[in-house]
């Protein structure tokens, strides 16, 4: 009987954690992602206009956003719902638009900007989420 109970418990746990849902079926409430239909904090995988993993309502790991036509719009990493590490945004033609880094949800260091042909047009230097220097090419 114990083995059967353990089996069903593990099925429930795996099923709960491995839920996959379209991003449009989620909503933000108090800084957390909730399943719109059942109004519960979501844990699982998200696909659609944004793809990534959610743990206890917070984005985790690598995430990607997409234009309506399916081309990549942005890619970056999250830790407990905050942007961290390298962040890249793209023009609709697939060329990089901007690239920089986040730390604890805040832009830091040099952020570079590019035109639709991929030519660098500017750099902005961030400190404490504020642009301290702009350099135009």
Please provide the spans of the model-predicted regions.
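Glycine/tyrosine- and acidic-biased, solvent-exposed loop/turn segments at the edges of beta-strands
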Residues: 14-137
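Sec-dependent N-terminal signal peptides
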Residues: 4-14
């Amino acid at each position: 009987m114990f083995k059967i109970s353990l089996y069903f418990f593990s099925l429930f746990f795996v099923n709960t954690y491995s839920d996959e849902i379209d991003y449009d079926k989620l909503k933000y409430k108090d800084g957390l992602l909730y399943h719109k239909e059942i109004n519960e904090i979501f844990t699982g995988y998200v696909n659609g206009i944004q793809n990534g993993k959610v743990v206890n309502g917070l984005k985790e790991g690598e995430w990607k956003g997409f234009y309506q036509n399916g081309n990549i719009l942005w890619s970056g990493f999250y830790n407990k719902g905050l942007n961290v590490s390298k962040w890249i945004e793209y023009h609709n033609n697939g060329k990089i638009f901007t690239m920089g880094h986040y730390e604890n949800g805040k832009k830091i260091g040099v952020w570079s900007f590019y035109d639709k042909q991929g030519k660098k047009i500017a750099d902005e230097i961030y400190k404490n989420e504020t642009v301290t220097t702009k350099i135009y090419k």
